[in-house]
């Protein structure tokens, strides 16, 4: 199963694409040098398969590469980061 995480700035969201289909999204809006993530969602047919984890890993990798931070308002996104001390430096 091939997957990629892509930023879609026109729709203000990150997308996890698996085999050509968007299966998970993280909505965001820009704030200074950070993104605010109020919502993460996975297609019901793909829940329970770690898709949102893959999405968040890609989002954080992109933020790290672009020297930006995150404000995780979504409980899932917040828990994902809190459970990974190595990612907490990305918190705004």
Where are these regions (language model features)?
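Short, hinge-like loop/turn segments at secondary-structure boundaries
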Residues: 88-91
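Structural motif
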Residues: 8-10, 31
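Conserved acetyl-CoA-binding loop-helix of GNAT-fold acetyltransferases
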Residues: 48-61
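Conserved N-terminal entry element of GNAT/NAT acetyltransferase domains
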Residues: 1-6
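Conserved beta-strand in the GNAT
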Residues: 21-29, 36
